[in-house]
Amino acid sequence: MGRYASGDLVLAPVRIGGGGERKVRPVVVIRGGERGSLLVCPVSSTPSSDGVSIPISLEDFASGGLDLFAESYVLAAHSATIQPADVAGKKGSLLPGTLAAIREAMTRLQRQAGHPP
């Protein structure tokens, strides 16, 4: 089990949209949670049709990155909670400004849904 920080891009099994099988995909660590859990947002090669998608490219990484030939998208509306033991590997870390944009999008979504940030 590793230690992961906000802004880390890791590989972990997540479900997008709540249905179907979990699939190992890149996810951005938004923050650590209770009992060591991690709040993450999945990354996809296509933007979400039902929520906010934040584009990321190689220029958004402080270190490492994805094998990107085109933009990828952080799916802010599909956050999930995982355990550090679920992480299959670390791919890199996002720049602080990129992480801030993702958090801002998540806060807007929570306010629209009537939940406090």
Positions of PLM-derived features:
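Compact nucleic-acid interaction/catalytic patches
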Residues: 18-24, 29-64
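C-terminal terminal-subdomain/extension
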Residues: 63-117
